[in-house]
Amino acid sequence: MSWFSGLLVPKVDERKTAWGERNGQKRPRQATRARGFCAPRYMSCLKNVEPPSPTPAARTRCPWQDEAFIRRAGPGRGVKLGLRSVALGFDDTEVTTPMGTAEVAPDTSPRSGPSCWHRLAQVFQSKQFRSAKLERLYQRYFFQMNQSSLTLLMAVLVLLMAVLLTFHAAPALPQPAYVALLTCASVLFVVLMVVCNRHSFRQDSMWVVSYVVLGILAAVQVGGALAANPRSPSAGLWCPVFFVYITYTLLPIRMRAAVLSGLGLSTLHLILAWHLNNGDPFLWKQLGANVVLFLCTNAIGVCTHYPAEVSQRQAFQETRGYIQARLHLQHENRQQERLLLSVLPQHVAMEMKEDINTKKEDMMFHKIYIQKHDNVSILFADIEGFTSLASQCTAQELVMTLNELFARFDKLAAENHCLRIKILGDCYYCVSGLPEARADHAHCCVEMGVDMIEAISLVREVTGVNVNMRVGIHSGRVHCGVLGLRKWQFDVWSNDVTLANHMEAGGRAGRIHITRATLQYLNGDYEVEPGRGGERNGYLKEQCIETFLILGASQKRKEEKAMLVKLQRTRANSMEGLMPRWVPDRAFSRTKDSKAFRQMGIDDSSKENRGAQDALNPEDEVDEFLGRAIDARSIDQLRKDHVRRFLLTFQREDLEKKYSRKVDPRFGAYVACALLVFCFICFIQFLVFPHSALILGIYAGIFLLLLVTVLICAVCSCGSFFPNALQRLSRSIVRSRVHSTAVGVFSVLLVFISAIANMFTCSHTPLRTCAARMLNLTPSDVTACHLRQINYSLGLEAPLCEGTAPTCSFPEYFVGSVLLSLLASSVFLHISSIGKLVMTFVLGFIYLLLLLLGPPATIFDNYDLLLSVHGLASSNETFDGLDCPAVGRVALKYMTPVILLVFALALYLHAQQVESTARLDFLWKLQATGEKEEMEELQAYNRRLLHNILPKDVAAHFLARERRNDELYYQSCECVAVMFASIANFSEFYVELEANNEGVECLRLLNEIIADFDEIISEERFRQLEKIKTIGSTYMAASGLNASTYDQVGRSHITALADYAMRLMEQMKHINEHSFNNFQMKIGLNMGPVVAGVIGARKPQYDIWGNTVNVSSRMDSTGVPDRIQVTTDLYQVLAAKGYQLECRGVVKVKGKGEMTTYFLNGGPSS
């Protein structure tokens, strides 16, 4: 994954940090099942070995996700990857998987006759994707392979033209017209080969070249039929068979074009044979055999072309899925970055990322992510009158108002070079001067304060509620970073931060309250007046802090600001249209006067921006990326890097082992095709040759063997209808590459035996010997004219000599049958090219031994002699035995080795192409699988990371369905228990000395305390609790925030929080014992309704608001060290559950007057 760019791309196995293990366990990865592409079946039971089960697409989206990629696709806008025929669709069975690939759902309904014919018709039709753009990408995807295949085909055809020219010109005086035709064809093929090799060769040109080749082949076929001497319906039959075969396998054309071309070439030969041999008495027999031969060749072509094309399209779908997974992973990375950087500054996030990616040894303490920064200014701002505003708003309006207001503050902070630290209810604080130091940090904070007061004045004007801002600023040093293991939030700590907080508390509404330290950094650029903060805040009075209130900027500062605004406006105008506009997280569309808020930069034009973003189609993005990847990749380089050149085996043994375990789900269909070829061969043999009981027995035995093999292979798919032993046998064959290859070779061998078996039952007596006896001549002196004199003619089945064996007059059909048996091996796409080459040479060698040296050799010699007799009879001329003309053709038994070599070359080239494609597809699929697994792991990690920032139910809300960017999360909770737990004397413990690294060691101990609290809240018994945040040394948690944790009847979520509070007290005692400290905790508990929500859809921060939260905080601040103070409402619930409580009495609470409170002393006595 090193090639991915992203902030966090960790290996999941290395995420062994404490927070990761406690914040959600990784879901066990489900075993991935190889999903075969279900093609229309050749037989009803020949389904995929393991039919894919459709999985509903699960879409997830967070509000901070990339809008262009996760946008909801409108009707008709999404691109489905389902295959379809040009005329017929697969809509009834297609299922779109989450990765975007279309699969065919298993069809368990009974198949009717029309349904089977419908599926059979689909096999013969061209496949294409519904999207024309996707179809073009697919053609580009395999263009390099097709270009290479077409180039090799041109070379083969040049060789074939040379062979035909040799066969025609060697034995007799050639015909000039046919020689010229073959020469022109050779030249054209050479020219086309050069054209195909050019870099400028384009996809559209490939179709033109393919159809030009078909035209040339038709012309050669016509010329060969006219030039044949002597003429016969079977003369040169192997040539059109070869043309038909390469049309399906080596020409890059669609199925429909291949079927039409194959049938056209076949029909052309049949018409020529019928027209040129109309007077032959045996014409019907040979034409019938030719029809069967061509039908078988076309069937082999279809059985080869269909699965090859489907496999290629499936490979394209998987590769596109890989591209989509990669892009999705990149988007996930960006979303993760956006989410993390919304909570943590980049310098902190990068350090945490490095630690997450690196395995760490066990350490005594958790690592602390703290950095020290000097010369910074801290701004605290609080909304005065927020309680009145909240009381007049619904939950949605409150969250919306805070979201809009703080989003505006975030924009102002960015403009004024301030870093937002945290939002605490209605309090907002930021720092200028970190992570990068700035000399004008005090000016930035003052300008930020001025802008915030202006912004709140607009809220006051629109809502009619008297709200205002108190702003306090102090300059000094801070420690910034993250504490704890859960609910990370970036924060700052130091004495100067504490002082800045009190500056806000002691400030005045609508004014900016600063210290002398900040005033010194302002260099007199602002007019000030005494602030008298000590009169309003005890801490300021105790520390004798001199404070000031900003009156306004000096004249010099006003001039500088005016010049700066002018420069910024000029720069903005020059960059208009190049930079994206700021889009708020939500417009004030539901407030009283949205026009006023346009002055804040929030207007309806943001909707147009969102619409422009939504217009970006993620499918188009994937297709565009795929197009660039197709243009950039090099198939030759992939082969060179991963595959051995001749053997086509992987260079890495582990890849070869994985590939050897690859299962072809269409293996049963391959065996069924072999059975079909066998049946065609039987028809040819029965039509042309005499047959005996022995041959019928052999054919019946072969048929039964092949049929049983087909049925055994089908058992694996047909399920529980068969015995377990038979099912195990079927699985052992189909799911093992070695076993299925052995069965495939065995099937081809049976077909080959059926092609040559009849040769041994024919008469093997030489005709020359018989004629020599009758004419009292030596066999070498016998010519065709002598045979004509004694009425020996072609086509007689009766024995010509003594004996009972019948005569086989047309051995060319033995050659044709053997060629069909060899072509049947091309159907088994899973057999390696070397395996097919060896098998072809072995079978061809056996056949040639029989042909040249065995008894069947006389059959071919007799045929050549009788064919010459037939030629003499056709010429109607009379010759005597002395001046008999020589035969004008090469003997069939000498032509056969060359024919076999040509077919073997074509078979090997096709096998190489299929295996090379399959192996490269396997590489891509392996990458796709790895990327999908990594994506799943990263998604699980993202989910844990998300849960570490937002509560699980909130995260689930955003992940449940796709949402618009302006939708907010808000929830009114009727009965929530809230806890504030603070270390009362931590401020006394915290000192900034050189001995403790300016206070860092104090924060290290605080980090350990918070980490202990996080570990406790992660325990199963406290699953109803949710950590909200930490505020300095105060820990905030709540329970009952969602339906799964809210117990309306038993109120168990309330007792769980009480138990947790007591558990924290015990843990603090344990910490004091081991750290030799005397920390004192004060804990306040309250219950009641709250409003929960996420502030800032782009920079999310979960929080809860309401009177319940404020009172709970007061229970903490007015509490007693080492005691847990609760309200009357909580007392009533806990007392009913048997908890031990005591009445403290009446306590004065700020904003609430006097309240009766209680101390929680222990749990139920039982």
From Swiss-Prot:
Effect on the protein of changing residue 660 to A: Abolishes phosphorylation by PKA and PKA-mediated down-regulation of enzyme activity
Entry keyword annotation includes Phosphoprotein: yes
Gene: Adcy6
Subunit structure: Part of a complex containing AKAP5, ADCY5, PDE4C and PKD2. Interacts with RAF1. Interacts (via cytoplasmic N-terminus) with GNAS, GNB1 and GNG2.
Chief location category: membrane
The protein's name: Adenylate cyclase type 6
Gene Ontology molecular function, alphabetical: adenylate cyclase activity; ATP binding; calcium- and calmodulin-responsive adenylate cyclase activity; metal ion binding; protein kinase binding; protein kinase C binding; scaffold protein binding; signaling receptor binding
Outcome of substituting residue 311 to A: No effect on phosphorylation by PKC
Cofactor note: Binds 2 magnesium ions per subunit. Is also active with manganese (in vitro).
Keywords: ATP-binding, cAMP biosynthesis, Cell membrane, Cell projection, Cilium, Glycoprotein, Lyase, Magnesium, Manganese, Membrane, Metal-binding, Nucleotide-binding, Phosphoprotein, Repeat, Transmembrane, Transmembrane helix
Record-listed Mg(2+) 2 binding positions: 382-383, 426
Residue positions, PTM Phosphoserine: 53, 554, 574, 660
InterPro entries in the cross-refs: A/G_cyclase (IPR001054), A/G_cyclase_CS (IPR018297), AC_N (IPR032628), Adcy (IPR030672), Adcy_conserved_dom (IPR009398), Nucleotide_cyclase (IPR029787)
Expression sites (tissue/organ): Detected in brain and kidney. Detected in vascular smooth muscle cells.
Entry GO terms, CC: cilium; endosome; membrane; microvillus membrane; plasma membrane; sarcolemma; stereocilium
Phenotype when changing residue 554 to A: Reduces phosphorylation by PKC and PKC-mediated inhibition
Post-translational modifications: Phosphorylation by RAF1 increases enzyme activity. Phosphorylation by PKA on Ser-660 inhibits the GNAS-mediated increase in catalytic activity. Phosphorylation by PKC on Ser-554, Ser-660 and Thr-917 inhibits catalytic activity.
EC code: 4.6.1.1
Cytoplasmic side: 1-149, 304-671, 912-1166
Residues carrying sugar: 791, 876
Presence of the UniProt keyword Oxidoreductase in the record: no
Topology, Extracellular side: 758-817
Function: Catalyzes the formation of the signaling molecule cAMP downstream of G protein-coupled receptors. Functions in signaling cascades downstream of beta-adrenergic receptors in the heart and in vascular smooth muscle cells. Functions in signaling cascades downstream of the vasopressin receptor in the kidney and has a role in renal water reabsorption. Functions in signaling cascades downstream of PTH1R and plays a role in regulating renal phosphate excretion.
Domain notes: The protein contains two modules with six transmembrane helices each; both are required for catalytic activity. Isolated N-terminal or C-terminal guanylate cyclase domains have no catalytic activity, but when they are brought together, enzyme activity is restored. The active site is at the interface of the two domains. Both contribute substrate-binding residues, but the catalytic metal ions are bound exclusively via the N-terminal guanylate cyclase domain.
Result of altering residue 917 to A: Reduces phosphorylation by PKC, abolishes PKC-mediated inhibition
Activity regulation field: Activated by G(s) G alpha protein GNAS. Inhibited by G(i) G alpha protein GNAI1. Is further activated by the complex formed by GNB1 and GNG2. Activated by forskolin. Inhibited by calcium ions, already at micromolar concentrations. Inhibited by adenosine, AMP and their analogs. Phosphorylation by RAF1 results in its activation.
Catalytic activity: ATP = 3',5'-cyclic AMP + diphosphate
